[in-house]
UniProtKB/Swiss-Prot annotation:
The protein's role, per its UniProt record: Inhibits CBL-SH3KBP1 complex mediated down-regulation of EGFR signaling by sequestration of SH3KBP1. Binds to SH3KBP1 and prevents its interaction with CBL and inhibits translocation of SH3KBP1 to EGFR containing vesicles upon EGF stimulation.
Cell compartments where the protein resides: Lysosome
Keyword Repeat: yes
Lineage: Eukaryota, Metazoa, Chordata, Craniata, Vertebrata
Residues spanned by motif PXXXPR: 618-623, 678-683
Listed transmembrane segments: none
Superkingdom as given in the UniProt entry: Eukaryota
GO biological process, one term: protein homooligomerization
Post-translational modification N-acetylalanine, affected residues: A2
Domain BTB: 19-88
Gene for this chain: Shkbp1
Gene3D superfamilies: Potassium Channel Kv1.1, Chain A (3.30.710.10), YVTN repeat-like/Quinoprotein amine dehydrogenase (2.130.10.10)
Protein name, per record: SH3KBP1-binding protein 1
Modified residues (Phosphothreonine): T163, T693
Disulfide bond entries: none
Length: 704
């Protein structure tokens, strides 16, 4: 039984250095000497044994410390030997305990150890960083001014927003936005105005949505990413974002670069200019909350689970809304739009024919296929095989149902009239299928059981899926991603795990385990193998992410690049080179020092704050200003009484030992000292605690 005692009743404040001290740390007993525990001044143990901290003793008289004994063992070993042996204890746990006990030398050594894997410049995959933009000011009136709303001399097809001002660009201050708390979103959750909510990319453009406005960046080969558009401030949080940066085969003069944002049932659409800037096209109403917003070519599509679909056609400038069955999934390929519904039907829309076949406000939505069990179609993926003849593509559709069944249906171009035929069925999930992807080489399905993933290898003959030998099971794994219950950690639409990537290439999942995580894991969608992990360079939580397939340079031999875009809670945006990560998959990195090797090197010196030893001298860099080195090999200074090198060093320098580069670097390290204002140089001390100082030597052309 532990008994509390005062400093008088407990361990005496003064005792012999060789006195044996018995400790009970978390139920495990340790015995050591007073000298071992108190050689570091102002530590937890020196305060404990001097009576400044009241003690708690167990039934045997041992001092009880309610800490982890497993972590305490390497700490006690360090106090005994001044050498660090982690003994399997994680570095962060060891650092936390060392800070608790106030063991400054050990804390500094562990902090240097952590610097091996941390850098404000990221790792080799870090490709760029965009700071938070200037936020638009809050408007004081709700009436917009008349702007350039005429398109080709005709009035705009829809009303202008009376709740939006003209494009303010970069007007306003960041502080004004952050000082004003945002109103609650339609979901009732609080909003953080400064964090990135959504990120999307298309070709060489990026759209980033904050709570009440969005910005667009354009990649230029010579100057990198440049801010191209900033929207006015909106009254409600942005919940959906879509970007179309290039429309193939578009008619001259039509909008080929557009960005759209949805909030509630309203959709706002802007046209972007290649040279920068943009203009509002209009505001469209779906009538029900928008749950999916995307472009198919130059057609803007909005859907809701209620069964309502809205389409804005860039040619006719017409907004059309139509009711179908409750929509539970969708996918698009080419000009085909497929809608999966709760009644088991898959509806087909050819958006390319909208201007030609629009009749009586009918979008010509036709039923393509109905599930044999009439289960709800909860996930859809369509794959168009390369054209092998003039007849067209072989259409392959994979879909998942609410009962966990995965089916593959195919339609040959020559049998379009007969409809798709059921090709394969997999009953491997016991929860509803939430995602599915049919690519050139793999079939991937994800169910609602903590993102359980099943994958198959797809066999093809002349580009078409084949039954010989058929699809074979490949992998089973989970992409665990916890969601926040209080709305923090970002918008759920901005934290989609994927899979990301072109269907004829390797695809990846992006895993964010906890809502406020600053680290993301990139994994192959086919096997679950880790490709890489990235951590925010500024330590802020990651609130949104996506993968961008970016066009290659015009230079000879260049190829498209794949980037991971991460939006942070502080409003910044970071970019990571996934192409390099994929190229290096499976290669063992040839790194520098290991943690064990670094600890061995640090045992030869002591670490102390540089500011305390250099006075008011400026530090060369934030990183190197943390610590300075002290000799620990002997009790005498490396420099003699007059500041001259020790005999071995003087002899080596007299003989010109070392390479030319080594001598240049040595002199360069001492050169900055010569530029400081002349001050009386203190006499070097022979104590252990003084840092090494550079030689005060006059340089001339023969110094090398």
């Amino acid at each position: 039984m532990a008994v509390a005692t005062t400093a008088v009743e407990g361990v005496p404040s003064r005792g012999a250095p060789g006195e044996v001290i018995h400790l009970n740390v978390g139920g495990k007993r340790f015995s050591t000497s007073r000298q071992t525990l108190t050689w570091i001044p102002d530590s937890f143990f020196s305060s404990l044994l001097s009576g400044r901290i009241s003690t708690l003793k167990d039934e045997t008289g041992a001092i009880f410390i309610d800490r982890d004994p497993t972590v305490f063992a390497p700490i006690l070993n360090f106090l005994r030997t001044k050498e660090l042996d982690p003994r399997g204890v994680h570095g962060s746990s060891l650092l936390h305990e060392a800070q608790f006990y106030g063991l400054t030398p050990l804390v500094r050594r562990l902090q240097v150890r952590e610097e091996l894997d941390r850098s404000s410049c990221g790792n080799v995959l870090f490709n760029g960083y965009l700071p938070p933009p200037v936020f638009p000011v809050k408007r004081r009136n709700r009436h917009s001014l008349v702007g350039p709303q005429q398109i080709g001399g005709r009035p705009a097809p829809v009303r202008r927003s009376n709740t939006m001002p003209p494009n303010l660009g970069n007007a306003g201050l960041l502080g004004r936005m952050l000082d004003e708390r945002a109103p609650p979103s339609p979901s009732g959750q609080p909003e953080e105005p400064g964090m990135v909510r959504l990120v999307c990319g298309h070709h060489n453009w990026i759209a980033v949505a904050y709570t009440h406005f969005l910005v667009c960046y354009r990649l230029k080969e010579a100057s990198g990413w440049q801010l191209a558009f900033s929207s006015p401030r909106l009254d409600w949080p942005i919940e959906r974002l879509a970007l179309a940066a290039r429309v193939l085969g578009g008619a001259p003069g039509e909008h080929d670069k557009m960005v759209a944002a949805a909030t509630g049932s309203e959709i706002l659409l802007w046209a972007l200019q290649a040279q920068g800037g943009g203009s509002e096209i209009g505001v469209f109403h779906l009538g029900v909350p928008v749950e999916a917003l995307f472009f198919v070519g130059n057609q803007l599509i909005a859907t809701s689970h209620t069964g309502r679909i809205g389409v804005w056609n860039a040619v006719t400038k017409h907004w059309q809304v139509q009711e179908v069955q409750p929509i539970t999934s969708y996918d698009a390929a080419g000009s085909f739009l497929l809608l999966g519904c709760s009644n088991g039907s898959i509806y087909y829309v050819d958006v390319q024919k909208f201007p030609l076949r629009m009749k009586d406000n009918d979008l010509l939505v036709s039923e393509l296929y109905r599930d044999p069990a009439e289960d709800g179609v909860t996930a859809l993926s369509v794959y168009l095989t390369p054209k092998t003849s003039d007849s067209g593509n072989w259409i392959e559709i994979a879909y998942g149902t609410s009962s966990g069944v995965v089916r593959v249906i195919v339609q040959h171009p020559e049998t379009v009239g007969s409809g798709p035929q059921l090709f394969q069925t997999f009953s491997v999930h016991r929860s509803p299928v939430t995602k599915i992807m049919l690519s050139e080489k793999h079939l991937i399905s994800v169910c609602a059981d903590n993102n359980h993933v099943r994958t198959w290898s797809v066999t093809r003959f002349r580009g078409m899926i084949s039954t010989q030998p058929g699809s074979t099971p490949l992998a089973s794994f989970k992409i665990l991603a916890l969601e926040s219950v209080d709305g923090l950690g970002g918008c759920s639409a901005g934290n989609d795990i994927g899979p990301y990537g072109e269907r004829d290439d390797q695809q990846v999942f992006i895993q964010k385990v906890v809502p406020n995580a600053s680290q993301l894991f990139v994994r192959l969608s086919s096997t679950g193998q880790r490709v890489c992990s990235v951590r925010s360079v500024d330590g802020s939580p990651t609130t949104a992410f996506t993968v961008l397939e970016c066009e290659g340079s015009r230079r000879l031999g260049s190829r498209p690049r794949r980037y991971l875009l991460t939006g942070q809670a502080n409003g910044s945006l970071a970019m990571w080179d996934l192409t390099t990560a994929m190229d290096g998959l499976g290669q063992t990195p040839a790194g520098g020092l290991t943690e064990e090797e670094l600890m061995d090197q640090l045992e030869q010196c002591e670490l102390s704050p540089l500011a305390s030893s250099r006075g008011s001298f400026p530090s060369p860099s934030p990183r190197t200003s943390l610590t300075s080195l002290h000799s620990a090999s002997s009790n005498t200074s490396l420099y003699g009484p007059r500041g001259s090198p020790s005999p071995p060093q003087a002899e080596a320098r007299r003989r010109g030992a070392g390479s030319f580069v080594d001598r240049c670097q040595e002199l360069a390290r001492g050169a900055p000292e010569l530029r400081w204002p002349p001050t009386p140089a203190p006499r070097p001390s022979t104590s252990l605690g003084n840092p090494l100082t550079a030689l005060k030597k006059t340089l001339n052309e023969t110094s090398f």
